[in-house]
């Protein structure tokens, strides 16, 4: 072809040395040769001979003068290499030996297998919604500094205190909602890239929620409210759940699902524009978190209907564990009433009270709808919704 | 009867030596070769242990091989890395130096590696043996026979800084120092290159029942095997080859010329304290 006998070739490096990238040209010229093939290297760099033999020796090639005799080490290195699945398709099971490799990468064998990523089955972690929801999440990230007009409102003292109490409650719930996906993130095999990416955005969302609710609590210079023991006990049961589908069910399908009603209520009933705005922004994020959980749980349940009884048992177990605790603290319930009342007159408080009771009805209805969507029978959905924690999350 | 394990000695010139020999030990044990290793702090201690029968095989530097053969004339080299064959060392000057030939280094300062480095000191200095140069040694890792690259790198730094007129180093280290920027790329010129020489080998002085099996298993180590390739990468080879001993004549001559060891293997170099 180039006038060379078969198995031989020639490459001219011009003035380029092997200390300046010349090895790339040599390796490229060697690649198509068979082992034993000969490559004559020419060039004007003063160190070419010295550097060529040093470079070639270390890579298992022979050298005769400035002719490289091709070795096989580069091909041996990739002898047992496999593809980490296909870039456009998700495998049924992700192999630990694929490690952190990009989906579809050619994986050189020999590294230690990926440790700790035990959630490696498509049926357990994947949802077809993941790529779309991740893209939405990436596009929907908002900046707390600019998305909200942080002018302090001038509310009556008791109403402001009620807002602060609700914010105090929200912050600890957001911390739980951050910690749970964060704990599972590292256990999900990175082959399921979009799931990992989505959960990373979920964690980042919760970080913003923690920020904006904290900032609203401190906006008017008051002290933070009470963190009730019952609420924290309820959240601890979420953190303790070691099973991914169960944790996702309790946190997102039930807890964050219930929060959709709560945040929508806060947006509608907020006594000041800052509270309304941050409830609105958090609500948009939470809707994604719930959609993701409903997606992967729905697909998982279709593949393994036995999971349904596991999820049911988890609700009962959690209810029993929390039976001796207060659930939603009086301080939070009262604060919601005052927030929705906007004033301390009997008529306003009465209206606030009715709105909060109506909120609880809405929460229950929405939970039952989601449970039915996950395939629970109507009666079971009613039973389980009623057993959901009084702390909402 | 249970075979006494084959005991190999290696010098702990770097922490990775433990990883390497633990890995090789697993490789041999998995193939029913009873195998242990002992680490030494320097090559003189290892050579004495080999000659004294405390170890069966020594993973020897070329200089350690020279001493082993002087202490035990029947010593053999049973295997070596593909990367141990046909090395060269260079004497380099700055590109703008007036020095064109080794003889023009007369009266000038030449930086070298440690006193006991074959590639960084003994072999390149032998090229200048008839030229009265002022040797400036950079003593890093004395006793490690040049396994530690620090002395050569310090000599290269001194060259770049203008503190010496020339510096001595292995061909591969000249490439390394030029790529990493210790030497300015294209900023140096080679004024002398040694002939090819060989580097490390597995030396033995007495027979052991398992020696043939050790060599067979070593030579069978396959770079295509993902279980052993990381160890071979760490040890810096792509294939083990049978030992050969005709690549050490240059070093034998340099050792005699500089009186590093006596003819019977006694340590004779002035100021050499491993
Ligand atoms: Fe949140
Ligand atoms: Fe959330």
Residue ranges with predicted function:
Chain B
Residues 1-54, 60-62, 226-274:
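N-terminal hydrophobic or amphipathic helices and topogenic motifs
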Residues 2-10, 81-93, 145-146, 180-218, ...:
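Periplasmic-binding protein-like
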Residues 5-31, 40, 63, 87-155, ...:
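Bilobed "Venus flytrap"/periplasmic-binding protein-like clamshell domains
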Residues 35-37, 135, 190:
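Generic structural signal for residues in well-ordered beta-strands
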Residues 45-49, 151-158, 164:
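Short, hydrophobic alpha-helical packing/hinge segments within bilobed ligand-binding/sensory domains
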Residues 49-104, 116:
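Acidic, polar ligand-binding/catalytic clefts
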Residues 54, 109, 163:
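Conserved functional loop/turn residues at catalytic and ligand-binding sites
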Residues 59-72, 129, 157-186:
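A ligand-binding cleft/hinge motif common to bilobed small-molecule-binding domains
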